[in-house]
């Protein structure tokens, strides 16, 4: 099955498109929520934006993760030897840990300096993840 992905002329590029669209959906919604937490759009309730935005971000993450796993399956040895891939995986783990901390402490209800700092760290981690993703090919 995975050999077919690697050899079919449209399969891998299609996975890349799904991966990029998933990342766009994830990051677009996270950035909107972060901007709201930092004070932009005060008329929009954070809880309402979070309910919709985090659901869409989860869909984006799922699409990016599923397509990423399929792309990984086509060349696992090469990717595991790639420093950019290794760093991307470490940053993904850090982003997940950061998100868990954010939600477990109830940051959406507090909207304090720690919540804003955690969201800023999240954005920086995701910028690093995207950058590493681009560097994997080089």
Identify the role of each PLM range:
Residues 1-138:
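Polytopic transmembrane helical bundles with strong interfacial aromatic enrichment
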